Structures are given as C-alpha cells and as structure tokens.
Curated annotation (Swiss-Prot):
Signal peptide: none annotated. The genome of this virus consists of two linear, positive, single-stranded RNAs encapsidated in separate virions. They are designated RNA-1 and RNA-2. This is Protein 2b. InterPro entries: Tobravirus_2B. Its main location: virion. GO terms for cellular component: virion component. It comes from Tobacco rattle virus (strain TCM). It is found in: Virion. May function by interacting with a small, flexible domain located at the C-terminus of the CP, forming a bridge between the virus particle and the internal surface of the vector nematode feeding apparatus. Keywords: Virion. It holds the Pfam family Tobravirus_2B. It comes from the Viruses. Belongs to the tobravirus protein 2b family.
Length: 255
C-alpha cells in the first residue's frame, strides 16, 4: 500500500473503514478474506472519507465498510486466525458528507449467505470428476472420429480398387465351349458401350456373335455391376451377387 494515509485513496473498492477507525485494505474481495489477504493502518486524517460511512460503523460490532457499502464482519474463533466474512451490501445511495442520523434506516440490497464448506468441497470434486469424464469422452470421441475417418478412407480406397472404368476392349469374362474360347468384351458401337459376345476362330482372330447389353449405370452381368464413380462410368465386381445367382439365371445367355 505504500506510505502516507490510505484515506487519500478513498474511494477504492479494496479500502474499508472499520469499527476502530482504522483503514483496512483487502487484496481480494471474496466472501471470506483471510488474514494473509488484508492489512490495516491507523490513519492521522479521515477527512477524505464522508462522515456518513464513519458514523455507520457501530463500535460494538467488529465490522468494516467500503465506499460501495460492502459490509464485512471480523470473525475470530479460538482455533483459527482472524478473518473477515462478508455480511452483505448496504444501499449507500443516501449516504452523504454528514453523519447519519440515529433513526437512519439501513437497507441491505444484498445479504451474503455462506454455504457449508464440505458441500462446496464435494461440489468441487463432482465438478472435477465431471470435467475429467467430459475430457475422457472428448478424447474417445476424437479417437473414434479418427478411426471413422480412416475407415472411410480405406473403404474409399477399396471401392476405388474394385472400380474399373469402362473402355472399348475391356474383357469381363472368358469361357470354353466345345473346344472353342468365348469371351464377353466391351465394345463401342454407335457411340454406345455394349457387352459383346465373341468367339475365337483361329489364333488372335475373334468373331462377334452378338451385342447383348447396353452398359449404362445399373446394368449387371454375372458379378459385375455398372456404376458411376466421380462422373466416370465403370464396373465393380460384386461377389455377393455372383454367389446368389441360380442355375437358371446362369444358363441364360446374359445375366
């Protein structure tokens, strides 16, 4: 606080006048102010402090008040050091330079209610546990989100690896019938991609037997399904569909 009368610092939220006419400085303005957080001074001049505040102090009650009207009671238990406990907040709107008259009616705008310390401690512990649980859940959610992102990435990669863009000459199937090799191949016919059945006549020569399926999105052949991926038309292989095909369907020319 420094030297000189502290009264020159009035008004200041941290400066109080007590029942002994001393000035008390609070480092903190909490409901309980322990001895390590307040110091006092016997001033030589109280003229900067309005007489109404000085006259408010009752010498029979250990108390102090600041310019805001915050009233603290000085408490001393046998087993504890002295401390100040906030009692409430007085309406000081009618406090002036003169002493308060004996019949002045004091009005409290707020009375401080202290709670049980053990309950406060339990509440703090519960809040701490709650925060720890929240943090744990947040960490787990973050971890799950990372796993989810990785799974989506792997799924996308798997889908990409199972996707082949349709192009002229793409072979989807080979078979051997009566000693002759047959194949199902993609051909571009009149600007349309079609599934064409071809037979090997001699060596590298293939003869077209017929164009059967227009390869557009949704078309199916054996385990192949025509799909669109990133704006491109292609095929992916569906092993589940292939395994579910019955004999009658397989005997058909195109499935």
């Amino acid at each position: 606080m420094g030297n000189g009368d502290w009264s020159s610092k009035w008004p200041n939220d941290h400066l109080f006048i007590d029942d002994f006419g001393k000035l008390v400085w609070f480092d903190v303005l909490t409901d309980i102010v322990k001895i390590s957080h307040f110091v006092s001074q016997v001033p030589t001049d109280l003229s900067p402090i309005p007489s109404s505040y000085i006259s408010f102090i009752d010498g029979r009650i250990p108390m102090c008040i600041n310019h805001l009207g915050w009233v603290y009671i000085r408490v001393k238990f046998e087993s504890e050091e002295v401390f100040y406990q906030k009692f409430g907040e007085v309406d000081v709107s009618r406090f002036g330079e003169s002493e308060l008259p004996p019949d002045f009616e004091v009005t409290f705008s707020k009375v401080t209610t202290l709670v049980n310390k053990s309950l406060v401690r339990k509440s703090e512990l519960l809040e701490k546990m709650n925060n720890e649980l929240k943090q744990e859940l947040t960490n787990k959610l973050d971890s799950l989100e990372k796993v989810n992102v990785q799974l989506k990435k792997e799924l996308s990669q798997a889908q990409q690896s199972n996707f082949t863009e349709l192009r002229d000459g793409l072979i989807l199937n080979f078979s051997k019938v009566g000693g002759r090799i047959h194949r199902m191949v993609v051909r571009s016919i009149q600007n349309q991609l079609k599934l064409v059945s071809e037979i090997n006549n001699d060596g590298d020569r293939w003869a077209t037997m017929g164009a059967t399926v227009i390869l557009k999105e949704g078309a199916q052949y054996l385990g192949f399904v025509v799909v669109k991926n990133d704006g491109k038309i292609g095929v992916k292989f569906d092993l589940t569909r292939l395994n579910s095909l019955d004999n009658q369907t397989l005997l058909a020319s195109v499935v």
